[in-house]
């Protein structure tokens, strides 16, 4: 049996402000740093150790990983950083407040933009300074692979090559792997691992800073999965994620 641990980054500044973040490179809040520290302490307390870790090129995920590994006294762990683990690109929605957007367009439309499998928000213009082609960290990525917007289907198509070429072979080689990434890049992995339907993936919410353990058989098929930590706290965090895209009630 193999084990894989997935972890969404701790609370970011735009999580706190309830804004669509996507590829915008915002940092963790103090709460987010504390979540990462507690996650690392929990992993250490439960006896977890890792031979290899992976994360995205966005600082909120990188810093979460650093803090967690530091709390485990394991900052020597080799880390692979790859753009394919980035958050889903939210196009023109990036930077907008989710509740205000819901008040303008309706809860249902925002839920579609946030969670529908094959519907993407309006793309960024090619000349928009927020377009990733203007960001030096993507300079070596072919221009036709850089998104101006994405739906979850697009995110799955981006993430799975990295799973197939890097993460899965490492697990099969017996390496203990931790992936610190983002809500939607992790949903892409979960959809693949659990064979979640396009409709059901809409209801999958991943809380920040909570280690999610997958026990896998020799074919990397899930035997079971579970969050470490307090169940009530995790349920509340998942409910909070689900509520982010709803208009505020007076």
UniProtKB/Swiss-Prot annotation:
Substrate binds at residues 8-15, 21-22, 60, 87-90, 98, 114-115, 183-184. Pathway: Carbohydrate degradation; glycolysis; pyruvate from D-glyceraldehyde 3-phosphate: step 3/5. The active site is at 9 (tele-phosphohistidine intermediate), 87 (proton donor/acceptor). GO terms for biological process: gluconeogenesis; glycolytic process. The keyword RNA-binding does not apply. It comes from the Bacteria. The record marks 182 as: Transition state stabilizer. It catalyses: (2R)-2-phosphoglycerate = (2R)-3-phosphoglycerate. The keyword Repeat does not apply. GO terms for molecular function: phosphoglycerate mutase activity. InterPro entries: His_Pase_superF_clade-1 (IPR013078), His_PPase_superfam (IPR029033), PG/BPGM_mutase_AS (IPR001345), Phosphogly_mut1 (IPR005952). SUPFAM superfamilies: Phosphoglycerate mutase-like. Keywords: Gluconeogenesis, Glycolysis, Isomerase. SMART domains: PGAM (SM00855). Pfam families: His_Phos_1. Its EC number is 5.4.2.11. PANTHER family: PHOSPHOGLYCERATE MUTASE. Catalyzes the interconversion of 2-phosphoglycerate and 3-phosphoglycerate. HAMAP family: PGAM_GpmA (MF_01039). Belongs to the phosphoglycerate mutase family. BPG-dependent PGAM subfamily. Homodimer. This is 2,3-bisphosphoglycerate-dependent phosphoglycerate mutase. It comes from Bordetella pertussis (strain Tohama I / ATCC BAA-589 / NCTC 13251). The lineage of its organism: Bacteria, Pseudomonadati, Pseudomonadota, Betaproteobacteria, Burkholderiales. The gene is gpmA.
């Amino acid at each position: 049996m193999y084990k894989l641990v997935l972890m969404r980054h701790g609370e970011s500044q735009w999580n706190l402000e309830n804004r669509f973040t996507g590829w915008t490179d915002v940092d963790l809040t103090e709460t987010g740093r504390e979540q990462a520290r507690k996650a690392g302490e929990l992993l250490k307390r439960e006896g977890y150790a890792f031979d290899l870790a992976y994360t995205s090129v966005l600082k909120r995920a990188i810093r979460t990983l650093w803090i967690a590994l530091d709390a485990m006294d394991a900052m020597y762990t080799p880390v692979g950083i790859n753009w394919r683990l980035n958050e889903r690109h939210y196009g023109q929605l990036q930077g907008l407040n989710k509740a205000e957007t819901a008040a303008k367009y309706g809860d249902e439309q925002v839920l579609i933009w946030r969670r529908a499998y094959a519907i993407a928000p309006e793309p960024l213009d090619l000349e928009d300074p927020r377009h990733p082609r203007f960001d030096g960290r993507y300079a070596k990525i072919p221009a036709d692979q850089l998104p101006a917007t994405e739906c979850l289907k697009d995110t799955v198509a981006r993430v799975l090559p990295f799973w197939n070429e890097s993460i899965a072979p490492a697990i099969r080689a017996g390496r203990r792997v931790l992936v610190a990434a983002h809500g939607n890049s992790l949903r892409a992995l979960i959809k693949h691992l659990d064979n979640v339907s396009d409709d059901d993936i809409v209801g999958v919410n991943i809380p920040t800073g909570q280690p999610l353990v997958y026990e896998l058989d020799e074919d990397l098929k899930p035997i079971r999965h579970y969050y470490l930590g307090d169940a009530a706290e995790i349920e509340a965090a998942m409910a909070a994620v689900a509520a982010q895209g709803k208009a505020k009630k007076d």
